[in-house]
Structure formats: structure tokens, C-alpha cells
């Protein structure tokens, strides 16, 4: 998921996306621990997508704070 796609979403949609990514990361960790994971690169991809979502959320929060001031 690209940063531009994330910037087009609302903060509520981003929070939902972050929740879904955290759940997926949790499941992937368990799959890795039990040796059932097929695509190990997906763990890295999910972790980076979550970081992108958090970054965009922080950018939107800062922009909203500056707009109020």
C-alpha cells in the first residue's frame, strides 16, 4: 500500500487499517513460531505498512493542530 493511497483515506479508515495490520502481524508471528508461515517477507511488509499508517495518522493530527492554531 502506497503512502499516497493512505493519504486519501480518513483518520477513521486509517485506524481501522492499522487494527487490521496489527491483527495480521499477530497471526504471522504465531505462524512463524509454529513453523507454518509460507511467505516470511509478508511479516516485513505488514510491519512497514503499519509504520506508514502511523506516520500518516501523525501527519494528519499535526496538520489539524496547526489548522486550529
Swiss-Prot record:
Gene name per UniProt: rpmC
UniProt record, GO biological process: translation
Gene Ontology MF term list: structural constituent of ribosome
The keyword Transmembrane belongs to this UniProt entry's keyword annotation: no
GO cellular component terms, semicolon-separated: cytosolic large ribosomal subunit
SUPFAM superfamilies according to UniProt: Ribosomal protein L29 (L29p)
Record-annotated membrane-spanning stretches: none
Cystines in this chain: none
Pfam families in the cross-refs: Ribosomal_L29
Similarity comment: Belongs to the universal ribosomal protein uL29 family.
Native organism: Jannaschia sp. (strain CCS1)
This protein's name: Large ribosomal subunit protein uL29
Highest taxon, organism lineage: Bacteria
InterPro entries recorded: Ribosomal_protein_uL29, Ribosomal_uL29, Ribosomal_uL29_sf
Keyword terms of this UniProt record: Ribonucleoprotein, Ribosomal protein
